[in-house]
C-alpha cells in the first residue's frame, strides 16, 4: 500500500478519550508538500465548551498532521501550535479492509498532558 492511497477524508473514533477531548473527529490526509511519499493533513475536533480550558490547553480544534505509511503502519505527528508535537498517532491497517480502516493508539504529548498520559485507542474509517 502507498501513502497516496490514504489521501482523502477520514472519520476518527476514539475509545475513552481524555477529559475535554471529543470521542469523534475528522481527518484530512494529503500529499506532503515537500516529501511526495509522505502524508500531511489536518485533524478537526469539536472542542465545544472545553476549548481553551486547562484540561486541553495544548490542543486546538484544528491541528496539523505530518507522517508516513511504513510497511502498513500509519505514523503521524500532530501539532496544535505549528511548532511542537502535541500528539502522536500509530496505527495499522485492519486486515480485510482494503486500506479503508486503520486501528491504533493516539498519545497526548502536549504541554497539558499528564506525565503518564494513556494511549487512547482510535479507529480511522475512510469516507467515500
Q: Can you name each region flagged by the protein language model?
A:
Residues 1-128:
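Central antiparallel beta-sheet cores of small beta-barrel/beta-sandwich binding domains
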